[in-house]
Amino acid sequence: MAYNRINTLSTITATDQPQDTTWWREWYTLRWGRYYGTYKPGKYLLPCDDVECDRLDIMHKFFLVTRQHEMPNFGGLHSYPLPDQPKILDLGCGTGIWAIEMADRHGGRGRVEGWDLNMTQPESIPPNVSFHRRDYEDPWRDVEPNSFDIIHMRLLNGSVENWPRLYSQVFRHLKPGSGYLEQVEIDWRPQSDGDPRPLAESKLMEWSQKVHRGFARSGKKLEMDPNTKGILEDIGFTVEHKKIIIALNPWPELESKKEMARWFNLGLNQGLEAMTFQSVIHWLGYPEPEVRELIERVKEDMCKREWRTYCTMHVFLARRPLSPGRRA
C-alpha cells in the first residue's frame, strides 16, 4: 500500500518565498534555499524539506537493496524474527517509510511508533502506526520499560550528543531476553580499493574532512565510533557487528555490488547539500558560493570508477539478555 507524503515543503529560493509566510515560520526556517525545522533549533543539522525527504526515501531503498543482497532476512527491513504482534520503535524515523513498511509487513498486527524532531511523515498511515515529535535524547519517563521487541536506528550519526546515554535508555525499554536494538550507520569517510593517491588529493576527500569537522564542532560527531560494539557490551547488550563495503559508483564486478553502488551514489548525490550547508557554512564559516562549488566538484569525483572508492556500512544487532545489564 502506498502512503503519500503531503505535509512537507518543496525546496525554494529566498526570492520564491510565499507572500504570507506566517503558516510556515512556526515550523521551518529558510537558509541557503533549504528548509530546516524550528523545533529545538541546532539539534539536527540537516534540512527537512521535500528534497531531503526524497533523499531519505532513496536511502531507504538503498538499505533494502543492500541488506537483501548481504543480509537477506525479512525483506531487508530487520534481521531477527519478531513475535506475531510486535511492539516496534523507530528512533529518528524521518519520513516514516521504515515504520510504515514494518506495519504493512506484519499485517497491521502489533504497534509501531516513530519519533523524530520533524513531522515529515504522511498524514494517511496504517492504523497501528503513530508518529511523535520527540527528542529521543530526552529522558523516556513516560515510556513503559521492558516493552519493545525491536528499537530501530538508522543514520543517526551526526544527530546524537551522548551515545552511551541513548543506548542505556534503549536497553531499559527492550524486552529482557528477546528485545533487540538494530542500528545501521554509514562511515562517510571515503576509502580506495586501488591507488589511494587520487582520492587523497581529491575534492571528495576535502569535502569529507570539512563535513566531519563541522559536525564535530556542533557537538554531534558524524564519524562512526570505533568502540561502538564495546560501548553496547558495557551497557549489557549481546552484540553482533557486520561491516558491508559500499562502492560509490558501479566499479565492482558483481552485479549485486553495482546495484548497491547505483543507489548509494544517487542517495549521496542528493544529500550533499543537506550534509554540507549547516556543517561547513554555519559551523566552519565557509562562504556559500565556495561550498556550492565544492559540492559540484564532489559530484564529479563520486563518478570516477578508476578510483575504486567506497564507504563502509555498519550494522549492529544488540540483544538485551535475560539477566540485568551491567550499567543500564
How does the language model describe each region?
Residues 5-85:
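Class I SAM-dependent methyltransferase Rossmann-like catalytic core
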Residues 46, 72-82, 116, 189-191, ...:
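Short amphipathic alpha-helical segments embedded in low-complexity Lys/Glu-rich regions
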Residues 85-142, 150, 165:
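Class I SAM-dependent methyltransferase SAM/SAH-binding core
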Residues 146-155:
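Short SAM/SAH-binding signature in class I
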Residues 158, 180-271:
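Conserved catalytic/acceptor-binding region of the Class I
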Residues 160-162:
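Short N-terminal helix/helix-N-cap motif within the alpha/beta-hydrolase-1
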Residues 164-180:
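A short glycine-rich, Lys/Arg-flanked "PGG" loop and its adjoining helix->strand segment in the class I
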Residues 235-238, 243-328:
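C-terminal lobe and adjacent flexible extensions of AdoMet/dcAdoMet transferase-like proteins
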